[in-house]
Swiss-Prot record:
It comes from Emericella nidulans (strain FGSC A4 / ATCC 38163 / CBS 112.46 / NRRL 194 / M139). Cysteine protease that plays a key role in cytoplasm to vacuole transport (Cvt) and autophagy by mediating both proteolytic activation and delipidation of ATG8. Required for selective autophagic degradation of the nucleus (nucleophagy) as well as for mitophagy which contributes to regulate mitochondrial quantity and quality by eliminating the mitochondria to a basal level to fulfill cellular energy requirements and preventing excess ROS production. The protease activity is required for proteolytic activation of ATG8: cleaves the C-terminal amino acid of ATG8 to reveal a C-terminal glycine. Residues 46-68 are annotated as: Disordered. The active site is at residues 128, 302, 304. Belongs to the peptidase C54 family. It catalyses: [protein]-C-terminal L-amino acid-glycyl-phosphatidylethanolamide + H2O = [protein]-C-terminal L-amino acid-glycine + a 1,2-diacyl-sn-glycero-3-phosphoethanolamine. This is Cysteine protease atg4. It comes from the Eukaryota. One of its GO terms (biological process) is protein processing. SUPFAM superfamilies: Cysteine proteinases. The gene is atg4. Keywords: Autophagy, Cytoplasm, Hydrolase, Nucleus, Protease, Protein transport, Thiol protease, Transport. Disulfide bonds: none annotated. Transmembrane segments: none annotated.
Amino acid sequence: MNATDIERCRKRIIQYIWDPEPKNDEEPGSPIWCLGTRYPPQCVEETADESRNPDHGQQQNTNTSAPGWPEAFLLDFESKIWMTYRSNFPPIPKDAGQEGSLSLTLGVRLRSQLIDAQGFTSDTGWGCMIRSGQSLLANSMAILLLGRDWRRGERLEEEGKLLSLFADSPHAPFSIHSFVKHGADFCGKHPGEWFGPTATARCIQGLAARYDQSNLQVYIADDNSDVHQDKFMSVSRDEKGTVRPTLILLGLRLGIDRITAVYWNGLKAVLQLPQSVGIAGGRPSASHYFVAVQGSHFFYLDPHNTRPALRYSESGTYTEDEVNTYHTRRLRRLNIQDMDPSMLIGFLIRDEDDWEDWKARIMSLEGKPIITILSESDAASWKGRREALDEVEAFDDLDVAL
């Protein structure tokens, strides 16, 4: 067992033994921003339904209220689609001789040899970045399909059809099986290995292109934090020149071991933009899906909960209990000082007006930028760039495992 395995086990033990739900007492006077929607501090109310289980599929303390949080924020938070580890799904074939690979953690190697001898039937211990990426993609598609103001419990039939695209089956276009296959074919990632932000972004791009009905283009910034307008337009425009819904993905490293303080305000601003669809990654050795920020604290959905696999349903027909496993009211937060600097940031551009609005907002942000929009992609546009963004790096999946 190496140092990484030991540290991961230590964190998991601490979380299981002592993981109280946060109270709104750290920065109660600060507004909360959830994917571009602002919840002012003066709207703080008691939780409306204290009988609701905040973390469906898990046993919780009988006191399930969320002390001091705005009810409107809680309704928004629990409406986000939450992807987690799953178990007992159809086997994902292993590569020959992979059991002894050092790229697999000790726990994954043991499970591979003792339980999943014929193939991986659970992604517990290795699929957290994939699940975080699925969360980012699913919520982007939910905004397109259901609207940003959609709330849990509404339009159940359409939500079921969306969830079916992410079911734990080789038949689902955005399943764990599809991510792993694309990762093996095009990203040099093998079953049971961690995916970094870059591989996850490439999988999202490839799978979305393969599934025509997604109505979603994907643009990946392939050099640092620069978004080249001409390249973006070549991806987003159709043959008539109309800008189609496009997901912008940026894999960044905002420091070495921690996020450099000069980028704190820029990262906080990401979740305040109306085009934001969240941040995947952002915690050492464990990926989360960050959707909200209050002051210096980021709220996230944690994929490190193993639930039964979701069966594939072509019609999208699921029971209430099955749908409930994709939502939680249970808040978790992390101070920006404790976040890992490697992450995948997403923005959803719905049309040309949205693109112009996003550009204007990015260019007007104060402080050191973490994103730059270039009007041309020639060499002249790079003048002065290294001085302006000397610590923002494109993320290389080989640097760190999430």
